[in-house]
């Protein structure tokens, strides 16, 4: 049986509560964006692809930079605080948009905060958690994050049911965002900023350059394979658009989105437990193959009930993969953990822009079925690549696998 969540360190629990409220705010907005862009503002599937892709690319570039800064003494706390603050301030401004390009702009600025905060936060979680519990710690954090998404989606649905329009719902997202920032200030009070464990030699001095070159060969192949898996994972805005195309009414979308995150939240901690016991290699492969199967099925001529069921099944993909991927990165980069997470998040997030453009254009110019089946086939190939290059077991100890 999986151990209780009491095994998770207090700092991880606190950061999980912050993520819960932040995603509460974020997911009051995100599931409404496809309808807001395409029906209120007159955009199309390509605009949605650009929306997802541009925002994730911006976030990814900042994750690379933030990850490098996170390994410097005293930087983690301000990076985490600044990242959450910017999201709280900018996210409600989406309600003021009068054109699709404005939504893209506000969403990009919103994701700046995510880019700043994510690597130092994940590095802090890895730092305070014993190696053998990291899968569960990240699973606990992701579970709380997804539970916040459940609450946000339900809040959006409730407000729509009471007659609020989409703009009003987006504006109300400022409330849980402010709560998240207040909780964060309490959590980080007394948390000592990461003091560098990286000596001059470990920072990449010439004396150990051959060691760094050798170890980087261990880090890069699995991370690049994860990037390929991310690329072929169809953007969620297009998945929402697909179920709308299959007859799902717009007012029901926030409720269905909440159901997706119920599945994600419930499966995240067990997924972390599986990663700790079976290893990320098997768990990530299972998640990728599940996505490929569901994407293929969504491409068929199905009714709204079947589309909803398949969409909810996608929640297991995140539950199986997210915590295992993060635990693997922490083990591959035990010294430069911030840099490792920066590279991982930057590459996997950076894959979203070309993916959004390609799949959005394919959806718009050909069909939803073409986009989904291309995604499914590519995902199957990416999983095969992952099985070839990913480590069958994770190395322990203090070796650093980054140049």
Report residues per predicted region.
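Central cavity-lining transmembrane alpha-helices of secondary-active solute carriers
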Residues: 50-68, 258-270
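Structural signature of the two symmetry-related core transmembrane helices
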Residues: 78-92, 174, 282-297, 376
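Helix-loop boundary and gating motifs at the non-cytosolic
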Residues: 5-56, 220-256
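C-terminal transmembrane helical hairpin of 12-TM major facilitator-type secondary transporters
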Residues: 281-325
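Transmembrane alpha-helix termini and helix-breaking/packing motifs in multi-pass membrane transporters
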Residues: 35-40, 151-170, 354-370
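Helix-to-loop junctions at the C-terminal end of transmembrane segments
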Residues: 62-74, 160, 267-279, 363-364
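Intracellular juxtamembrane helix-capping segments at the cytosolic ends
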Residues: 116-129, 320-333
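Symmetry-related core transmembrane helices of the 12-TM Major Facilitator Superfamily/SLC fold
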Residues: 168-186, 372-387
